[in-house]
Regions:
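Short, Lys/Arg-enriched N-terminal segments with co-localized hydrophobic residues
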Residues: 9-26
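Condensing-enzyme catalytic core mediating Claisen C-C bond formation in acyl metabolism
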Residues: 28-56, 163, 167, 171, ...
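Conserved catalytic cysteine-centered active-site region
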Residues: 33, 89-145, 149-180, 240-270, ...
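Phosphate/pyrophosphate-binding loops at sites that engage ATP/ADP/AMP, CoA/4′-phosphopantetheine
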Residues: 64-80, 188-193, 288, 322-336, ...
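Beta-strand segments within the central parallel beta-sheet cores of soluble alpha/beta enzyme folds
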Residues: 76-86, 112-118, 142-147, 197-204, ...
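Short glycine/threonine-rich loop-to-helix capping motif typified by GTGT followed
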Residues: 89-97, 308-312, 344-367, 394-396, ...
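Active-site-proximal alpha-helical scaffold in enzymes
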Residues: 117-148, 178-218, 278-284, 394-414
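Polyampholytic, low-complexity intrinsically disordered segments
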Residues: 204, 210-281
Length: 447
């Protein structure tokens, strides 16, 4: 290839890049909902490990709360379709086909019931499908939600089940979920100069929020856990380490063992059972059910590549794409978002996602957390619910449970964990499936 041919080749490539970038920007702006969609009711079960309950029990808990939350009342028979997220109950409890099972439970049959699967983002995908079904005008009212029952399996079995959400060969070579996010953390440390102390800041912040959430799986702060551990050791006649503060406790390898360096026990989310659901209606009929609907301002979805093709492990391509779509649809910018739930399956994930979503610049997320910017009383509260880390992570229920928190905050019903901002109008939820294979970002608005 001579110089002239090389020049023409490079010129053509530049034109393709410019055209593609322009098309992406324009398409994001054009992707508006043809009909506004509102959330008029929401419910969520308590998250945790429930040996005496099954999947239907916890979904009934969420569904009944949803019905009670509709200010002007609703007849379940008005629900025209069900979209239900579930990742792997076929593995965890040997039962698949959850759409019609839940449809029968709530008296919805013979109307349509569809199961969606996107690993940890399964129920967020259910909500996305429900939004589009309403926006198209095909339905006026749909129920969306998710569920998962994980506690009947051992930790090893749960790890095996969760590995189904990775590219087939990744788990076989040691890239379990903790392994992947351990590698992500080391890459982030190397690129930006962060360290394990900064991960501890995320953990401590989330554990401070969780005791304020009555539905959270873990309701103890790190200081509470430290004191409880000290009492337990003392009762057993074992010398108590001289922990000076929460970070001292988290540095102790006996109290906080390594899972996949630099991920330690308290950097990881738990095994959980739980369910969540929301009632969606067309914007034009929303006031028939409540005087204060919460509207879906924007929703985006992205997908990611297998780890072998990542050229940089310090960001998630799918998150950035989903955010671009949601911002384009809503006409909003990152600085318009007043608080957000993000997918903190591991502490490092929260740091990276708050950068990918545009809340902080790349490499600045860990500094923002250290400065207290993401605390409940900070300028950009993150994971007011306690996050996956403390609220719990019943995989198929997580996406809608994050939006339940955003809805609760925007309705002013979050109690002690209510974001202390005078005019709280816009919140968001970010949900990641697998090791970045599926991502959704949803923006809710109170008008």
């Amino acid at each position: 290839m001579d110089f002239g041919e090389k020049f023409q080749f490079i010129k053509a490539k530049i034109h393709v890049i410019i055209r593609y970038s322009y098309r992406r920007d324009e398409m994001a702006k054009r992707r508006k909902l043809g009909r506004g969609v509102a959330i008029v009711g929401a419910g969520m079960s308590k998250f945790g490990m429930f040996p005496d309950k099954d999947t239907k029990d916890v979904f009934a808990e969420a569904f009944n709360e949803m019905l009670a939350s509709v200010d002007k009342g609703v007849d379940p028979k008005e629900i025209e379709a069900l979209y239900l997220g579930n990742f792997s109950n076929d593995f965890f409890v040997h039962q698949s086909h959850w759409g019609p099972i839940i449809s029968d439970l709530i008296g919805h049959t013979p109307k349509p019931a569809t199961r969606t699967e996107g690993a940890c983002a399964s129920s967020a995908l259910a909500l996305r499908e429900g939004v589009f079904a309403i926006a198209s005008g095909f339905y006026d009212m749909v129920l969306v939600g998710g569920l998962e029952e994980m506690s009947k399996r051992t930790t090893e079995e749960v790890a095996e089940g969760l590995a189904l959400a990775t590219v087939p060969y990744e788990g076989r070579v040691g890239f379990t979920f903790p392994g992947v996010f351990g590698a992500v953390a080391t890459a982030y440390f190397a690129k930006y100069g962060a360290n394990r102390e900064h991960l501890m800041n995320v953990t401590i912040k989330s554990h401070n929020n969780a005791p304020l959430n009555p539905k959270a799986q873990f309701k103890l702060s790190i200081r509470d856990l430290m004191n409880a551990k000290a009492k337990s050791l003392e009762k057993k006649g074992i010398p108590v380490p001289e922990w000076q503060d929460e970070k001292d406790f988290l540095r102790d390898l006996k109290a906080n063992p390594v899972v996949a360096w630099p991920m330690h026990l308290y950097d990881c989310c738990p095994i959980s059972d739980g369910a969540s659901c929301m009632l969606l209606v067309g914007e034009d009929i929303a006031k028939n059910f409540t005087d204060e609907p919460i509207y879906v301002a924007g929703i985006g979805q992205g997908s990611g590549r297998g780890l072998h093709s990542w050229d940089d492990m310090t960001y998630f391509e799918a998150t950035r794409y989903a955010a671009e779509e949601a911002y384009g649809m809503s006409g909003l910018k990152p600085e318009d978002i007043q608080f957000s739930e993000v997918h903190d399956c591991f502490s490092i994930a929260e740091l990276i996602h708050i950068e990918d979503l545009g809340f902080f610049k790349p490499g600045e997320g860990y500094k923002a957390v250290e400065e207290g910017q993401t605390r409940l009383d900070g300028p950009m509260p993150i994971n007011t619910s306690g996050g996956l880390k403390c609220k719990g992570h019943p995989v198929g229920a997580t996406g809608v449970s994050q939006l339940y928190e955003v809805w609760t905050q925007l309705k002013g019903k979050a109690g002690e964990r209510q974001v202390p901002k005078k005019d709280l109008r816009i919140g968001a939820a970010h949900n990641l499936g697998g090791t970045g294979g599926t991502c959704t970002f949803t923006i809710l608005e109170r008008r």
